[in-house]
Each structure stands twice: as C-alpha cells, then as structure tokens.
UniProtKB/Swiss-Prot annotation:
Main localization of the protein described in the UniProt heading: membrane
Entry's localization field: Cell inner membrane
Family per similarity comment: Belongs to the ATPase epsilon chain family.
Coiled-coil annotated residue ranges, if any: none
One annotated Gene Ontology cellular component of this protein: proton-transporting ATP synthase complex
Family matches, as InterPro entries: ATP_F1_dsu/esu_C_sf (IPR036794), ATP_synth_F1_dsu/esu (IPR001469), ATP_synth_F1_dsu/esu_N (IPR020546), ATP_synth_F1_esu_C (IPR020547), ATPsynth_dsu/esu_N (IPR036771)
Assembly: F-type ATPases have 2 components, CF(1) - the catalytic core - and CF(0) - the membrane proton channel. CF(1) has five subunits: alpha(3), beta(3), gamma(1), delta(1), epsilon(1). CF(0) has three main subunits: a, b and c.
Gene: atpC
GO molecular function, one term: ATP binding
Name of the featured protein: ATP synthase epsilon chain
Keywords, in A-Z order: ATP synthesis, Cell inner membrane, Cell membrane, CF(1), Hydrogen ion transport, Ion transport, Membrane, Transport
Length: 140
C-alpha cells in the first residue's frame, strides 16, 4: 500500500512553525528546487533562502519563508531545521525592500570595511523574502 502522507516538522531556534501530516513539500535545497512526497528516498541537504510550500493532508497550503537551514528526509518523517523561519503572512514587504536596498548599497560600496559575502547573503535573504511575498499574493 502506498503512503499517502508523511509527517513534517518545521522548526527554527525560536519556535516550531509546523508539525503535522502533509501530502507534499516544495523547498529550495542547495542544489535547486526539491519536491518531497511520501516515500521519498532518505536525504540530508542544506537549504538556501526561499519558500517552503506545504500541501497539508486536507489539500490546503501553507507557505513559510526560510533564511536557510537543513532538510532531513527519512521514510516517515521530514524535518526542516531553519536558521530563521517566518510564516509568509508575517513577512513585511517594506522591510524586505529596505533590506534589499541596504544590501545592494553595501555590495556597491568600495570601502575596505565592506564584507562582500555578508552583503551578498543579506541580498539573497531579502530577495527570497520578496519572492515569497509575491508568490503568496498570487495564491490569494
């Protein structure tokens, strides 16, 4: 008999954002987009900033922004350990736009005190937040 659902836990250092049975999970891994469904092969990978699209057992969807982290897939359990995780509805578009602008300014600064890698990571997180906001506004 085929598995119809898998248990998912999404946690950050601050809180547990989701725990329950799901039909599928779409998430951004270090090598690209991943689709996790019941019966998926075991997997351990790092996550890039982006969206976790959860399709619950009843077919409804929930979207969570992840700043990065780790994904572990086992036969009956999927665990997302996020650096920072925020429900899409709680994201602030204006704050994300401002963070994007600050990161771009830092990347364009020519001073010796500019850490390009930090600025690039900040830009990636801000852009990922904006993509999550845009994707969820299309769903609603």
């Amino acid at each position: 008999m085929a598995l119809l659902t898998v248990n998912l836990n999404v946690v950050s250092a601050e809180e547990s954002l989701f725990s329950g049975s799901i039909k599928s999970l779409q998430i951004t891994g270090s090598e690209g987009e991943l689709g996790i469904m019941p019966g998926h092969a075991p997997l351990l990978t790092s996550l890039k900033p982006g969206m976790a699209l959860i399709t619950k057992k009843d077919g409804s969807e929930e979207v969570i922004y992840l700043s990065g982290g780790m994904l572990e897939v086992q036969p009956n359990n999927v665990t997302v350990l996020a650096d920072i995780a925020t429900r899409a509805a709680d994201l602030d578009e204006q704050a994300a736009l401002e963070a994007k602008q600050r990161a771009e300014e830092n990347m364009n600064a020519n001073g010796a005190d500019v850490d390009f890698a930090v600025a690039a990571a900040q830009l990636a997180r801000a852009v990922a937040q904006l993509r999550v906001i845009q994707a969820t506004s299309k769903h609603n």
